[in-house]
Amino acid sequence: MADTTILDTTCSSTLAANVEFSHATDSAIGISLKNATITEAEGVPNLKETGYDCVRYMGTCNGGQIYLGRERKKLKDYVAIKKFAIDDVDDYAAIAKESSNLRLMHHPNIIELCECFVYERSIYQITPAMNLGSLFDIVFEYMKWGINEKSAAAITRQLLDALSYLHQRRYIHRDLKPKHILIDSSGNVKLSGFRFMIELNHHLDCVFEFDAHLQNQLYYLAPEVLAQNIHGYTSKSDIYMLGISICEAINGVMPFGELEPLEMLHRKLNGQVPRPVDMISLKDDQKMGLDISHRPQEHLTRRFSKEMHEFIANCLDYDPQQRGSASDLKSSAWLGSKIHKNLGPVDVRQELNLDYAHFDLSLWEQEPLIPMEPDQKYEIVFDYSPIS
């Protein structure tokens, strides 16, 4: 049985990438092992023998480098190319695990793998180029005070489609956050970050595992995950992470982000629930004696719907049994309302209202300076053929 894993990457660069690596054992899925030459001046690998052109270096992410590329047979199709050095057995295993997870996924709102191969001691992963980057990128770079309600609803609807698909197959994502929500200029939303996905046991609807690497996601994790008690946690923990992520996108800041981890843990385990920041929630804060004078005018004057407040409150309910399922939330009062019922990718594009000409990947294209290289000897260790 093939051990395949997807590596997801979202980063604060114009190009957001997520790619899958497949590590073959005894199936048709496999690895192509070759030697690569990298231009020191440009940092651009020569991948022509693999069927891809690296257009230019874009940035770093998760210990790897990201390049904008194209498939040579389809010159109009841009891809994200990620390069990871294989210096650590644990890193290699983590990449393999993630690739294995993503291989199992076939959904329009989940990032897909195009191909993956190994050069010397580096893994290259190929995914579609999501040219707006991540939801985190969009908020951080262009929407300091957060996105509007309609764009939040349109994005949430696509995310719930992805989560419904996962949860119906008894998987828990466990790493949902704005950096793993990728968007393209057509308004398509794709969930990435599948390294920590876990499958529920056939006899239990909960799990008890707490991967050590999850400590990097503490601020997004549900109280029951942080508690690490005998009750375990279920797919409803993903719903909590969805609520935190939408709150962050709407408010422009990560909930609990100003707190030290121990204080954040204390507040979550004692039932404190973040809220969307608008004139209603700020008036409530003022009644409690809190100072709101430092709040920006954008927060003081905007007003979100009661239905949206209730939706996020339900996602962030301390009791996981009280949270709606992904399927139920799609027909909630907020997303089922006349205004939000039929939202789709076009609404994401319209409501974000960005200058999309700025995200035209052809503007980033340049002729990479690839040095002359000696004849390279390489061996195709396994044939690569995608699983349908």
From Swiss-Prot:
Domain Protein kinase: 52-335
Compartments in which it is found: Perikaryon; Nucleus; Cell projection, Dendrite; Cell projection, Axon
Disrupted-gene phenotype: Ectopic expression of pre-synaptic reporter snb-1-GFP in ASI sensory neurons. Along the dorsal nerve cord of DD motoneurons, pre-synaptic puncta appear diffuse or smaller and synapse localization of sad-1 is disrupted. Germline hyperplasia and loss of aak-2 phosphorylation during dauer development. During neuroblast division, daughter cell size asymmetry in the Q.p division is defective. Animals are slightly stiff but with active locomotion. In par-4 (it33) mutants, causes embryonic lethality.
Keywords: ATP-binding, Cell projection, Cytoplasm, Neurogenesis, Nucleotide-binding, Nucleus, Synapse
Annotated positions binding ATP: M58, G59, T60, C61, N62, G63, G64, Q65, I66, K82
Tissue-level expression: Expressed in nervous system, pharynx and excretory canal. Expressed in germline.
GO biological process: asymmetric neuroblast division; establishment or maintenance of cell polarity; maintenance of dauer; MAPK cascade; negative regulation of apoptotic process involved in development; positive regulation of peptidyl-threonine phosphorylation; protein localization to synapse; synapse organization
Gene3D superfamilies cross-referenced by the UniProt entry: Transferase(Phosphotransferase) domain 1 (1.10.510.10)
GO cellular component: axon; cell body; cell cortex; dendrite; neuron projection; nucleus; perikaryon; synapse
An example molecular function term from Gene Ontology annotations: protein kinase binding
Pfam families cross-referenced by the UniProt entry: Pkinase (PF00069)
UniProt effect for mutating G243S: In rr92; germline hyperplasia during dauer development
Chief subcellular location: other
Entry's family note: Belongs to the protein kinase superfamily. STE Ser/Thr protein kinase family. STE20 subfamily.
Function: Pseudokinase which may act as an adapter for kinases sad-1 and par-4 and thereby is involved in several developmental processes. Regulates cell-autonomously both neuronal polarity and synaptic organization when bound to sad-1. Required for sad-1 localization to synapses. Required to establish germline stem cell (GSC) quiescence during dauer development, to promote cell shedding during embryogenesis and to control asymmetric cell division of the Q.p neuroblast lineage, probably when bound to par-4. May be involved in maintaining the integrity of the early embryonic cortex when bound to par-4.
Notes concerning its domains: The protein kinase domain is predicted to be catalytically inactive.
Quaternary assembly: Interacts with sad-1. Interacts with par-4.
Protein name, per record: STE20-related kinase adapter protein strd-1
